[in-house]
Amino acid sequence: MPKKCRHLLQTSDLSLDEIKLLLEKASVYANDFNAVSLETKEKMHNKIIVALFFENSTRTVSSFEIASLRLGAKIVKLNMQTSSASKGETLTDTFKNIHAMQPDAIITRHAFSSAPFKLAEFSQCPLINAGSGVSAHPTQALLDLLTLYQHFGSLENLKGKKIAFIGDVKNSRVANSNIKLLQRLGLEIMLCAPSSMLPSVSLKTTHNVEEAIAFADILMSLRTQTERHNTPIFASLKDYGNAYCITQQRLKAHAKNKEVIILHPGPVHRDIDIESAVLEDERSKVLEQVKNGVAMRMAVLEFLLLD
């Protein structure tokens, strides 16, 4: 029988008290990446973490690598394009072979939503889901929450705030994880997209970006995930941007909360998802999200490997 260990496959794996602890620890690291205690560094020194990414990544894989190194751990990144997976080895066999080398944690990303849950059934080390299909990306939701926590000052202040997700919500694991987490914390949610990009959920929806902007205290723009579309929804990304881009003009004309903040999980399609001028605006928290990704992943790794 595999021994019991903690995994992070979805945000519901964490209690609210554990989420608060992660926010507190990550806030310390966000203020100073070098604020890792000597005791933590000593305990992490001999830890070996494997990053097993079957899909492309820039921010997430780099963020986990930097987080691991800042804690004092070692990380091994596997290039799946040159691995035995490209020769026909199954996901399960690849994982079991890596698992047999006894790493202290495995971080995985896969196109199938069920992949991390299947692997967790026999994993004897902590498994972190760094993105699975369109269903879950828990550390992204946590770092987004950290960004909101910093801006609004507390979880209590977040209750009742209104957030609009604009873009390809249906195919976004980021949106899915964020929605589930933010509902637990009492935020009001609206989804804004063309019908083909909206999931079947009992939430407020609109096809009108101006309505979403007027509704929100927080705007979360999402990339159009054309790689997950069977047929084109718009003739071009420019046509999509004409309808859904967050622009200064739209913010000025329609935002009831003039201090509305703008988030995006990346990669951003400039002038398609968000206008370049808005990305440079102080209301944009996109680069803060990237920084907070390192801090939150430091907190998550420490929580799973040491606590």
Curated annotation (Swiss-Prot):
Keywords from the named record: Pyrimidine biosynthesis, Transferase
Biological process (GO), any one: 'de novo' UMP biosynthetic process
Pathway: Pyrimidine metabolism; UMP biosynthesis via de novo pathway; (S)-dihydroorotate from bicarbonate: step 2/3
Molecular function via GO: amino acid binding; aspartate carbamoyltransferase activity
PROSITE patterns on file: CARBAMOYLTRANSFERASE
Function text: Catalyzes the condensation of carbamoyl phosphate and aspartate to form carbamoyl aspartate and inorganic phosphate, the committed step in the de novo pyrimidine nucleotide biosynthesis pathway.
Subunit details: Heterododecamer (2C3:3R2) of six catalytic PyrB chains organized as two trimers (C3), and six regulatory PyrI chains organized as three dimers (R2).
Protein name, entry field: Aspartate carbamoyltransferase catalytic subunit
Gene designation: pyrB
